[in-house]
Amino acid sequence: MIFMKEIVAIIRPEKLEEVKNALEAAGCHGMTVTEVRGRGRQLGITESYRGRDYRIDLLPKTKIEIVVNDEDVDTVVETIVKSAQTGDIGDGKIFISGVDEVVRIRTGESGKKAV
């Protein structure tokens, strides 16, 4: 039985500090953050530079990965939504999937104790 979930949030880079601070205030301290590029419905943007238009198809985003116990999923998701939301296209997505096992390398602990 799976008791843990991985939450992957793709957010605007400028919202990272706000999201990180909100997660820490909610008691979620462990996370992995990666700078990524992507697009969804936003389909990129067009910018002008020196009189020429340039299409940017893949926009800079920030990916946050967090593994939590099942009982913490709703709190973490709500915290991310509230702190990352601008109401505009391009705010991002949150993906939630099951985690079969977690092992803390330092101690060898596994399961909920390792989260």
From Swiss-Prot:
The keyword Transcription applies. It comes from the Archaea. The modification O-UMP-tyrosine is found at residue 54. InterPro entries: N-reg_PII, N-reg_PII-like_a/b, N-reg_PII/ATP_PRibTrfase_C, N-reg_PII_CS. GO terms for molecular function: ATP binding; enzyme regulator activity. GO terms for biological process: nitrogen fixation; regulation of nitrogen utilization. Keywords: Nitrogen fixation, Nucleotide-binding, Phosphoprotein, Transcription, Transcription regulation. The keyword Transcription regulation applies. Could be involved in the regulation of nitrogen fixation. This is Nitrogen regulatory protein P-II 2. It comes from Methanothermobacter thermautotrophicus (strain ATCC 29096 / DSM 1053 / JCM 10044 / NBRC 100330 / Delta H).
